[in-house]
Amino acid sequence: MKEVSQQKKELVNEITQRIKASRSVAIVDTAGIRTRQIQDIRGKNRGKINLKVIKKTLLFKALENLGDEKLSKLKENSGGQIALLTSDLEPTEIYKIIESTFQKTAPRGGEIAPEDIVIQPMTTGFPPGPMMTEFQKVGLQTGVEKGKIAIKKETVFVKKGETIPKDKAKILEMLEIKPLEVGLQLLGLYSEGVVYSKEVLSLTPERIANDMAAAFSQAKAIAKSSMFFVDEVLRDLLAEAKIKADALALAGQFITEDNVKDFLVRANVNAIILNNVLNKGSTQETPEEKKEEAKKEEKSPDESISEGLGALFQ
């Protein structure tokens, strides 16, 4: 017990010294991250950050030893599986590194499915045997193709929001299906007397500009709807008022210098329409004319011939 206690003291002292020597200190959540991924993160960022997985009690003890109230605030949001990240980089650079640690991975079992996990028809590469029973147990329709186990039908394996059972997690790993994305989650960062949250560090110039533009548009819309006269909306309000006034003048037959052309155009259009209607009416045959035309058509061929001969001697 004394040996274990001594090891803990040495570890706390090591952490304390590491924090003292670093410009920036962060606590990150490592839940769901496997040892291999931690090693990959260390390898890719060697010389930029130092990452050490540690028990909360030992880390909190080291923070207490430093006696810095602001630094001790890092304990407030620290829970679950955590690691200490130290660096001499700027807080924003550290945050970029943390965000870049996310990778696709297969579940272990017990995780919540972020989306529907769908298994498509495929040849698995496994020979027929006990494995076929394992696939069938979890609801997969299987067969044999070219001497290998094949999944015959598309299957919604786990629905969004459901807990992924261990037996299904095992199958997903065997099929190399990686529905989860895991990485370091920033819980808090301390640098040069200032404590930063994830929400603050996630702000980018582009996001700030977009948020400001959206806020300006919303404020402008409210000012216009409430008729609040400020420089930013005055031009729009005047333009809308003119459009409404012009429409009202036209509807009320009120002629002004601004709308006289509109009245002339309207009068011209109406004249054209009236002229077309009158011309159409004048070309229509009366009932008497139609009857006379019908009588002419009813004459026999002999009558037509005699009338023609008679006309020659008139």
UniProtKB/Swiss-Prot annotation:
Ranges for region Disordered: 281-314
Residue stretches spanning the membrane: none
GO biological process, one term: cytoplasmic translation
GO CC terms of this entry: cytosolic large ribosomal subunit
Superkingdom of this protein's organism: Archaea
GO molecular function: large ribosomal subunit rRNA binding; structural constituent of ribosome
Sequence ranges of Basic and acidic residues compositional bias: 287-302
Keywords: Ribonucleoprotein, Ribosomal protein, RNA-binding, rRNA-binding
Similarity comment: Belongs to the universal ribosomal protein uL10 family.
Function: Forms part of the ribosomal stalk, playing a central role in the interaction of the ribosome with GTP-bound translation factors.
Record note on quaternary structure: Part of the 50S ribosomal subunit. Forms part of the ribosomal stalk which helps the ribosome interact with GTP-bound translation factors. Forms a heptameric L10(L12)2(L12)2(L12)2 complex, where L10 forms an elongated spine to which the L12 dimers bind in a sequential fashion.
Protein name (database record): Large ribosomal subunit protein uL10
Naturally occurring in which organism (per UniProt): Thermoplasma acidophilum (strain ATCC 25905 / DSM 1728 / JCM 9062 / NBRC 15155 / AMRC-C165)
